[in-house]
Amino acid sequence: MVNLVIVSHSARLGEGVGELARQMLMNDGCKLAIAAGIDDPASPIGTDPIKVMEAIESVADADHILVMMDIGSALLSAETALDLLDPAIAAKVRLCAAPLVEGTLAATVSAAAGAGIDKVIEDAMNALEAKRVQLGLPSQPQHASLTAAPVDDRDARSVSVVIQNHNGLHVRPASKLVAALAGFNADLVLEKGGKCVTPDSLNQIALLQVRRNDTLRLLARGPDADAALAAFQALAAENFGEPTEAAPARRPASADRVEGKVVLYPQPQDRISRETSAAIGQQQLRLKRAIDRTLEDLSALTTLAEATFSADIAAIFSGHHTLLDDPDLYAAACDIIRDEQCSAAWAWQQVLSDLSQQYRHLDDAYLQARYIDIEDILHRTLRHLNERNEALPQFSAPSILVADDIFPSTVLQLNAEQVKGICLQAGSELSHGAIIARQAGIAMLCQQSDALTLQDGENVILDIPGKRVIRG
């Protein structure tokens, strides 16, 4: 837990920043204290080391206390306060150079979400980036702790492994890596080809595009460094829970030709218009609750997938769970809600649509196909935000489901006795939906440009080897 102290020359400014920051709080995950101005009615502008010391002591029931300051003597007063404090409390205190207003707001969101002190400081130091982008200014180098650049071997121990997974370190094995390295008391960095990310973010790992035969290095420093490296090495030896070779595709018995009546399945439309909302805390709370309900859905889908198919299929949805349970996503949406005073739905759409586009633009076809997983998660969260129920169409055997694209969670819920095939105008044979369809014994054709010209109830044949649809 990280608590914050706001130090300002002006009592009004300090209270105002505190008022803004409290709008970010949805729980008791972060306490705020204010030490602003001096007790001199004739000359109230200034800072008082005793006030700073007392403010720090009032929130000292945390692992760390981060002190945010405005200018000049605020820093001197904070440093003097450290000398006055009990050494045990002073050891918890960090002074932050971030801008007072933007930095305090970003730090509050990060601390309230449960981030550690280094991440809270990093977010505070990067707080001006959104404003720079909006003003068309070039981005500044990101302030980060261990992730800013490759860690010197002299500063950390490391282990390198060669990835043997057939499809590289995609979402499912990456989620196992996140889980395996969570909880170690160590600073950890994953490095591939000079690019570094922290292993607590599934999205960052996926965007590294770690392919088969790539070398991946984990660097660690801290009390649990050796244990973390051993866990990484052990997981790599097990190929991150996957076979080294791709499992043979399981096809339906009549895979070469499947016939049925068309059932058009319109892709759910989730485009959210921007809505203004000054209730920042309320919108952030709505989003948190929708994410929590979506995480519950994904746990249920994981259980269903394991009961219906296999642990491999279940790992798709446990991977979705890990991907969604990334505090950086929620923090980014909270920043948008705060900075743009918009609805939770619009902010969440911006964050996940941007992530989906990042996947679409990867040059690894297997990872590129994961864009639909992000959109599946986005759709499910927006359903909860808007309190909207949704049901699959009614199918009568034999049917051919026709759509622009299809979510993995939709394919999971199809009955293979009724749905004999899926025909998509877009889609990918490498998608998780296609993997589930193969295990279910449902034929699938993707990239059929004329798919949406088919009519409901029309009889069609899917020619799988020829990758074409035969009408009539």
UniProtKB/Swiss-Prot annotation:
Active site: 9 (tele-phosphohistidine intermediate), 170 (pros-phosphohistidine intermediate), 432 (tele-phosphohistidine intermediate)
One BP annotation, GO: glycerol catabolic process
Catalytic activity: dihydroxyacetone + phosphoenolpyruvate = dihydroxyacetone phosphate + pyruvate
Keywords tagged on the record: Transferase
A cellular component term, taken from the record's GO annotations: membrane
MF terms (GO), sorted A to Z: phosphoenolpyruvate-glycerone phosphotransferase activity
Domain PTS EIIA type-4: 1-135
UniProt region (PTS EI-like, N-terminal part), positions on chain: 266-472
UniProt cross-references to InterPro entries, sorted A to Z: DhaM, DhaM_N, HPr-like, HPr-like_sf, PEP-util_enz_mobile_dom, Phosphohistidine_dom_sf, PTS_EIIA_man-typ, PTS_EIIA_man-typ_sf
EC number: 2.7.1.121
SUPFAM superfamilies: Enzyme I of the PEP:sugar phosphotransferase system HPr-binding (sub)domain (SSF47831), HPr-like (SSF55594), Phosphohistidine domain (SSF52009), PTS system fructose IIA component-like (SSF53062)
Annotated HPr domain residues: 156-243
Pfam families hit by this protein: EIIA-man, PEP-utilisers_N, PEP-utilizers, PTS-HPr
Misc: Unlike the carbohydrate-specific transporters of the PTS, the complex DhaKLM has no transport activity.
Function: Component of the dihydroxyacetone kinase complex, which is responsible for the phosphoenolpyruvate (PEP)-dependent phosphorylation of dihydroxyacetone. DhaM serves as the phosphoryl donor. Is phosphorylated by phosphoenolpyruvate in an EI- and HPr-dependent reaction, and a phosphorelay system on histidine residues finally leads to phosphoryl transfer to DhaL and dihydroxyacetone.
Quaternary structure (record): Homodimer. The dihydroxyacetone kinase complex is composed of a homodimer of DhaM, a homodimer of DhaK and the subunit DhaL.
PANTHER family membership: PEP-DEPENDENT DIHYDROXYACETONE KINASE, PHOSPHORYL DONOR SUBUNIT DHAM (PTHR38594:SF1)
Domain statement: Consists of three domains. The N-terminal dimerization domain has the same fold as the IIA domain of the mannose transporter of the bacterial phosphoenolpyruvate:sugar phosphotransferase system (PTS). The middle domain is similar to HPr and the C-terminus is similar to the N-terminal domain of enzyme I (EI) of the PTS. The IIA domain of DhaM (via phospho-His-9), instead of ATP, is the phosphoryl donor to dihydroxyacetone (Dha). The phosphoryl flow likely involves HPr ('His-15') -> DhaM (His-432 -> His-170 -> His-9) -> DhaL-ADP -> Dha.
Family, similarity comment: Belongs to the PEP-utilizing enzyme family.
Name of the protein described by the UniProt record: PEP-dependent dihydroxyacetone kinase, phosphoryl donor subunit DhaM
Native organism: Klebsiella michiganensis (strain ATCC 8724 / DSM 4798 / JCM 20051 / NBRC 3318 / NRRL B-199 / KCTC 1686 / BUCSAV 143 / CCM 1901)
